[in-house]
Amino acid sequence: MERNMKTKKPIALVYGHPNIGEYDLTSDVYFWEGLQDTVKVYSFSPITDFETHYTTIEPDVIICIGINFKSSLESVNKRIIHLNEVPDDNVLANIIVAQTVFKNSSNIRPKFSVFTPTYKTGERILRAYEGLVNQTYQDWEWVLVDDSPDEDTWIILEALAKSDFRVKPHKITPITGGNVGLAKNRACSLSDGEWLVEMDHDDYLLPTCLEDLDKASNMFPNAGFMYSELCELYEDGKMKHYGNIWGEEGYGHPDNNFGMGYSVHYWTEQNGKNYLAHRYPDINPYSIRFNFSMPNHVRVWRKDIYQKVGGHNKRLPVADDFELIVKTFLETRMIHVKKMLYLQYNNHDSTVDNNVKDINRRARLIKDHFDLKIHNRIIELGK
């Protein structure tokens, strides 16, 4: 009979201990019940190359002895324990095993989980990663579910994960076979953050995106969803537009066919470059009923709200985002961050490009299904 595998013992990354190296220590917590057991220690001195250590070792706790160390990431700081002097080995082992349980039971998590399903993305995924690395707010994790039938993208994701502990790729079989709703649902279910940030596999978050979202969520703590403005552009740099009316005068203009006249284009500068930004509407009785005027990227759900409304519909291969937006509107308040925070790239071969008729057909039926609830919600919000 095959033996069951042994579980991972508590792991500590230790700085400032005279005993350098990798070794086991035995704790005597609850020794009177015969529960003595080992913990794993990785000891370095002084603190050098912390991010590499944290990425490769994946410790439960970080012990700093006589060292005043602080990470730039708050979720990492919550795992740090400062000691003034070197304890006996059994005391150190007891601290490690106890604090491993206490901290892992304290729901330590980053504020933002950026979630991304990938499909034959290849090198384009590096553009998405570059946008994350350049964020002014760095306490994030990136949860990816590779839905590719080959290994090319997976190899790139594994390499990123080995160099950055915040990158967390997953391969789930069977793959979805093109069911975008299921792929996004899987990615969100694996995410630990307080907020879930949707990013497509070849897109780009502008540098202040997460910082601006952090400020907005703190300003309006009762809201469960946020969205911003974006620029849609092609791989050659040409920018997409709907109609030819620019600026705020386009709002409500009879010749503006962008988002039924509620959406506008405007020029804005980011990183020394001018972009044609798209401002999608504030929620109103018309915009919430149509997929072409619903909130666009960047879209962000508070995780408890996302779970409460059921997340992305696993049985909707397309139009899943519209259905989720409607369900979110019925449940919570929304924040419109009126700033361009997202670059959405179009390679003429996206899910939207290849399924326009099916997406619009399903979206109209979703509107019909939720129409009365939308009406009642609008009445409720108007009270």
Q: Where would I find each of the regions flagged by the language model?
A:
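N-proximal low-complexity "stem/linker" segments adjacent to membrane-targeting elements
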Residues: 2-7, 85-131
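A conserved acidic beta->alpha catalytic loop
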Residues: 146-156, 200
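Catalytic core of nucleotide-sugar-dependent glycosyltransferases
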Residues: 250-254, 340-347, 353-382
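Glycine-rich, basic loop-to-helix element that forms the pyrophosphate-binding segment
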Residues: 173-191
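Short, acidic, metal-binding catalytic loop of nucleotide-sugar glycosyltransferases
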Residues: 130-139
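Acidic donor-binding loop at a coil-to-helix junction in glycosyltransferase catalytic cores
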Residues: 317-324
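Short aromatic/hydrophobic "clamp" motif used to bind/position activated sugar donors
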Residues: 196
